[in-house]
Amino acid sequence: MHPAFSVIFLTTLLGAGQGLYLAMVTGQLYAVARFLPAQADQFYAVGSLVALLLLIAGLGASFFHLGRPERAWRAAAMWRTSWLSREVIVLPIVMALVFAYGVAHWFEWTQPLFQVGAALQVDLTLLLGVLGTIASLALFVCTAMIYAAVRFLQEWHTPLTVSNFLFLGAASGFMLAAAYSAYIGNPLVTFYGTWAVILTLVGLASRLAHLRRNARLKHKSTVQTAIGVRHASVVQKAQGATGGSFNTREFFHGRSQSLLERLRTVYLVLVFPIPVLLIGLSYLIGSSNLPIIAFFVQFAGLLIERWSFFAEARHPQNLYYQSVA
Amino acid sequence: MTQLALVIDLNVCVGCHACVTSCKEWNTSGWAGPLVDQNPYEGSPTGTFFNRVQTFEIGTFPNTETVHFPKSCLHCEEPPCVPVCPTGASYKRPDNGVVLVDYDKCIGCKYCSWACPYGARELDAQQKVMKKCTLCIDRITDAKLSERDRKPSCVLACPANARLFGDVHDPDSEVSIAIRERGGYQLMPEWGTKPANHYLPRRKTRMHIDPEELTRVDNPWRKEDLTDYTGEETLDDVAW
């Protein structure tokens, strides 16, 4: 497939935004449980604002993918069957909840509304946090299922697509939370950094499993089933046009196999070992810059990872365009 | 229920692209148009087509066969492009089974083109909406036309009569009989999309070639002319 920058930025920015928001709520839950020192409400408010900006940027990127962006509002119509429609519905819900969570913290609407059990006092921010977490997780599933639900793109048609989007998005968000904490100099760097490393490692396991699966993938369609001729040797001589077409542009990445393999190595290094080492090093030398560098290195790696994700998918229609494939 | 479809006889198609050009002509000026071409006279021409003829060579030299393979939207009975459309612009007509795009609803997200394993959909570079074969819906449903003309443009244009059109759910229709009696098949049956369009396979032909036919020999007429020449006047000696 042809990797479109709009979709690369859409999926990575949404992932980082949702991850950062999940990190904020996780931090608050830990503070409620008294595992962590409570932070000023401003901390969560600013964190949610950054998450919201990332979500808005992701939404903005998505418009560049549309031929007719002025009609984008129509895209919520088919939520019963289309994962794209479901994403279009869940995304504004997540944005609204992230916004409300940030506003509630900013204005310190933290008077307990009711009490659960002996100690747990539930306030507005906690309620919004839980709702936002559920919506965020739903958004991860919707975004990933847009790709995982296309059964013809066998490279994508696996639950590992969903787990990759979830874990890599969450990892980059927690990495950003660690960078944010390091930037303002609060003691949560270790907490967020450790979670970021754990999520990065889970993401690595998921992505490696995905790569391994795809390397062994046997494609269902062959040129024989595509044109219905049972003969071992079928060679295309003409594609029906002298120049290119939508089909030759949309379904091919147009790069060499060696570049694809090199980029795979690059993102596997940028997304996984380097951020983990940088976080570990920042604990040792107490540097506040390293977590920030770790986030940017990982995010750059994730952009390449997403490019590869699109490029490595081989659409069955390519069988009709052998000279381009 | 009616399911209109094309049945394409690969045994007859000679790859003349008449169906391609007549499709383009009819549809660019009709309900589905325009189907614009970009850079038509320059190095990299491109444009929107509903129907393309591709050519495949089967076998290894010298035992090869050429298959000209016209391909357009197959109007699947289980069209995977329809449920993925977020706006409902992509739909299947309940009355005749033709899969269509509502150009006023399409947002150009290309998702349906990803969901079609046949690559039958193309985003129009000018109108920025998804386009595909409509089976000439504006012709075949036009009651003002005579029965003979109520057929897709490609079917009427085919000089070899390689394209049949009709209801594949009606067991007595021309297309159903052709599928039944001439081994009609579907493309990529492994996906369960149940394409309504079918293809009729090439038939085996055996040809006897005398080895002498493959080598160039002297003009046989001359050979026969080698008669005993005894000096009398022949036609060649006549001065005109």
Curated annotation (Swiss-Prot), chain A:
Coiled coil: none annotated. It holds the Pfam family DmsC. InterPro entries: DmsC. Forms a heterotrimeric membrane-bound complex composed of a catalytic heterodimer (SoeAB) and a membrane anchor protein (SoeC). GO terms for molecular function: dimethyl sulfoxide reductase activity. It is found in: Cell inner membrane. Keywords: Cell inner membrane, Cell membrane, Membrane, Transmembrane, Transmembrane helix. One of its GO terms (cellular component) is dimethyl sulfoxide reductase complex. Part of the SoeABC complex that catalyzes the oxidation of sulfite to sulfate. SoeC probably anchors and stabilizes the catalytic subunits. Its main location: membrane. It is a multi-pass membrane protein. Belongs to the DmsC family. It comes from Allochromatium vinosum (strain ATCC 17899 / DSM 180 / NBRC 103801 / NCIMB 10441 / D) (Chromatium vinosum). The chain crosses the membrane at residues 5-25, 43-63, 87-107, 126-146, 165-185, 186-206, 266-286, 290-310. One of its GO terms (biological process) is anaerobic electron transport chain. This is Sulfite dehydrogenase subunit C.
From Swiss-Prot, chain B:
It is found in: Cell inner membrane. It comes from the Bacteria. [4Fe-4S] cluster binds at residues 13, 16, 19, 23, 73, 76, 81, 85, 106, 109, 112, 116. One of its GO terms (cellular component) is plasma membrane. Keywords: 4Fe-4S, Cell inner membrane, Cell membrane, Electron transport, Iron, Iron-sulfur, Membrane, Metal-binding, Repeat, Transport. Binds 3 [4Fe-4S] clusters. It is a peripheral membrane protein. Residues 4-34, 64-95, 97-126 form the 4Fe-4S ferredoxin-type domain. Its main location: membrane. Its cofactor is [4Fe-4S] cluster. GO terms for molecular function: 4 iron, 4 sulfur cluster binding; metal ion binding. It holds the Pfam family Fer4_11. Forms a heterotrimeric membrane-bound complex composed of a catalytic heterodimer (SoeAB) and a membrane anchor protein (SoeC). Part of the SoeABC complex that catalyzes the oxidation of sulfite to sulfate. SoeB is probably the electron transfer subunit. This is Sulfite dehydrogenase subunit B. It comes from Allochromatium vinosum (strain ATCC 17899 / DSM 180 / NBRC 103801 / NCIMB 10441 / D) (Chromatium vinosum).
